[in-house]
C-alpha cells in the first residue's frame, strides 16, 4: 500500500521538542498550506493545517532551524491517532524536510 505525502507551507505553531523515555528525540509542529489548485478545469483555493512529527536523530539538526514562519517542504507518511478528546486526528510523520529559501 502506498502512503506518501509531500506538503509545502509555513510553520504556524511553535515547534515542541521532546525526548521519549527510550531516548528518541521528537519535534512536533503545525504546517499551514495555502495554494490554488486546478480541479475539473476550475481553480480552487486549497488550505489546510497539518500536524507534523519528526522522530529520530537523523532529522533533528534541521528541526532546530524551524521556527514559526519558516517555509518548508515535508515528505513523509500520514497516520491517525486518538486525541485526548476521543477524536481521531491525522498527523504527517516527516521523513524528509527541506527549508524553502525565502530569497532574502
UniProtKB/Swiss-Prot annotation:
Q: Which controlled-vocabulary keywords does the entry list?
A: DNA replication, DNA-binding, Primosome
Q: Please list every transmembrane segment annotated in the UniProt record, as residue ranges.
A: none
Q: Which GO terms describe its cellular component?
A: primosome complex
Record-linked PROSITE patterns: SSB
Q: Name one GO molecular function term.
A: single-stranded DNA binding
Q: Which interval of the chain is the signal sequence?
A: none
Start and end of every SSB domain?
A: 1-101
Q: Which Gene3D superfamilies match?
A: Nucleic acid-binding proteins
Q: What does this protein do?
A: Involved in the restart of stalled replication forks, which reloads the replicative helicase on sites other than the origin of replication; the PriA-PriB pathway is the major replication restart pathway. During primosome assembly it facilitates complex formation between PriA and DnaT on DNA; stabilizes PriA on DNA. Stimulates the DNA unwinding activity of PriA helicase.
Binding partners and assembly? Homodimer. Interacts with PriA and DnaT. Component of the replication restart primosome. Primosome assembly occurs via a 'hand-off' mechanism. PriA binds to replication forks, subsequently PriB then DnaT bind; DnaT then displaces ssDNA to generate the helicase loading substrate.
State the family named in the UniProt similarity comment for this chain: Belongs to the PriB family.
Q: What is this protein called?
A: Replication restart protein PriB
Organism source for this protein? Shigella dysenteriae serotype 1 (strain Sd197)
| UniProt lineage | Bacteria, Pseudomonadati, Pseudomonadota, Gammaproteobacteria, Enterobacterales
